Structure formats: C-alpha cells, structure tokens
Amino acid sequence: MGCGPSQQKEDQSQSRIPSPRKGWEEGSKADVRVTSSKENCSPQTEAAWPKHTIDNAKSLDQQAQIGSLPGTIPENSPTPSKTSRRINSDPVANGLTNKPQLPESWERPKSSDILEELIVQGIIQSRSKVFRNGESYDVMVDTTEKPLRKPPARLKKLKVKKEVKDFTIQDIEEKMQAAEERRKTKKEEIRKRLRSDRLLPTANPSDEAEPPGRVEVPFTKGLPAVNTPALEKSDVQEGEPLKRKKSESDVAQMNRNYSCTGLELVESDMYYNQEDNIF
C-alpha cells in the first residue's frame, strides 16, 4: 500500500521493463511473421524478383526455423575464445563472480621419461651407470653396407714420399761415414796435387842397378839423358865409322867424373826435398 504518486511510479516502471520470454515463443512468432510475408507475396512479385534474392530468402527462412527450436546451435556461433572473453569481461553476473576458466591441467613429461623412450626406440644408446677410472670405449663402425674404397693415386704418392722422408739412426750414421770417407779422399787428392806441383821426383831404385855407363839427371825433365862414351861408341859404330879412337885411360876418367856428378845431384835431392818438410 502507499500514496497515490508512489503507486503510479511503480506501475510506470513495471510497464517499461519487458518481461523475459522464452526462445520457443520468439521462434514461433518469427515463423508466423515469415509465413504471413509469404502469403502476402503474389506469384507475380516472385517472378519479378531475381533468383538469388529468392534463394537468400529461403535460406533465411530455414535458419529461422532451425533457430526457433529449443537447444539448437546456430551455424554462425561465436568461437569459444570469444565466449570466454565475454565471460571474463563480465566478472559479475546475477550477483555472482565468474572466475576465468583455465584449460585442462596436463602434466609436462619429465626428461627421464623422454630418455627412456628414446633408449627403447634405439635412437640413443644406453650408458652404463657405473663409471670407473681409466675406462675406455670402443667405437665400432659397421662397414658391411658400403665397402671402403681405395685412396686415389695422388694420395698414394704422398704416402710414399712421407715414408721415404722418415730417417732412422742407422741411415744417419751411414751418411756420416760416407761423408768422412769423401773428406779423406779429397784430402789425399789435394796432397798428391801439391806433391806433383811443388816436389821434385825422387831417384828410382832401378837407376842404381843400371850399369854406370849411363846416368840420367833427375831434376832436368826436358833435357836428354847423358850417355857414356862406351855407349856412344857402340851407337856410332852402328851408324858411322869412328873418326878418332880414345884411349882406355881417358874413358875411365870420364866415367868417374860423370858418376860423381850424378851421385852429388841425387844426394842433394834426397836431403833437401823430403815429404816431412812439406807439411
């Protein structure tokens, strides 16, 4: 109960607020409107309209009929993300707070589980858990699928050169000995050359055994040898007759003089020119 003006205000507010209606009532009203519009249309007007407009009208009628049924979902329904945004944007509805809906909780796989799966599949080889000091691992390669090819000729040549370049201690010692022998031979050759150039040749022992009739002068190379008169006599007798005959006493005296001169020359040569005095 109350005063008159207060009752009037309440009646006006109630008349303004529309009462909630159910979906099937709205759908039935829409069907009635569509059917009435179809009845009002004449066949002449339908012929005047183009075909695509008629098809669009039919599709709209079908959508309206489907949407009028209770519990139906329209084709152009919003995506779940949009609906979740709408729900989140309206945190308070009917006096209750709506919490944001999280996706279904799912556990992340552990690394140990992933490793076990890979080991079972054979992608990763299993490792021994016990480790020891000085433990070695052999890596084996299966060569049954593809046979190993021979290296090209160029690589073979390089390998041969490398093998030849590797020297041993024996090879080095042999080379050192050969070098020493060469050095000795060179020294001997140099000494021989010096002797032949600087030294005078020594008297041969065969000269002493020769008869005293002929004596050669050793230090005069280009001059002819001195002949005794006895030999000259024999040579002249073969070629031409002698013009004068010498006495035997003269011949003996001449032989003595020549023999003395030859001995003096040999002694001086042997005394002054010796090998020890050279070096």
Curated annotation (Swiss-Prot):
<feature type="region of interest" description="Disordered">
    <location>
        <begin position="1"/>
        <end position="110"/>
    </location>
</feature>
<keyword id="KW-0519">Myristate</keyword>
<feature type="compositionally biased region" description="Basic and acidic residues">
    <location>
        <begin position="22"/>
        <end position="32"/>
    </location>
</feature>
<feature type="compositionally biased region" description="Polar residues">
    <location>
        <begin position="34"/>
        <end position="45"/>
    </location>
</feature>
<keyword id="KW-0449">Lipoprotein</keyword>
<feature type="domain" description="SLD">
    <location>
        <begin position="121"/>
        <end position="248"/>
    </location>
</feature>
<feature type="region of interest" description="Disordered">
    <location>
        <begin position="178"/>
        <end position="254"/>
    </location>
</feature>
<dbReference type="GO" id="GO:0031110">
    <property type="term" value="P:regulation of microtubule polymerization or depolymerization"/>
</dbReference>
<dbReference type="Pfam" id="PF00836">
    <property type="entry name" value="Stathmin"/>
</dbReference>
<feature type="compositionally biased region" description="Basic and acidic residues">
    <location>
        <begin position="178"/>
        <end position="191"/>
    </location>
</feature>
<protein>
    <recommendedName>
        <fullName>Stathmin domain-containing protein 1</fullName>
    </recommendedName>
</protein>
<dbReference type="InterPro" id="IPR000956">
    <property type="entry name" value="Stathmin_fam"/>
</dbReference>
<feature type="compositionally biased region" description="Basic and acidic residues">
    <location>
        <begin position="232"/>
        <end position="242"/>
    </location>
</feature>
<feature type="lipid moiety-binding region" description="N-myristoyl glycine">
    <location>
        <position position="2"/>
    </location>
</feature>
<dbReference type="InterPro" id="IPR036002">
    <property type="entry name" value="Stathmin_sf"/>
</dbReference>
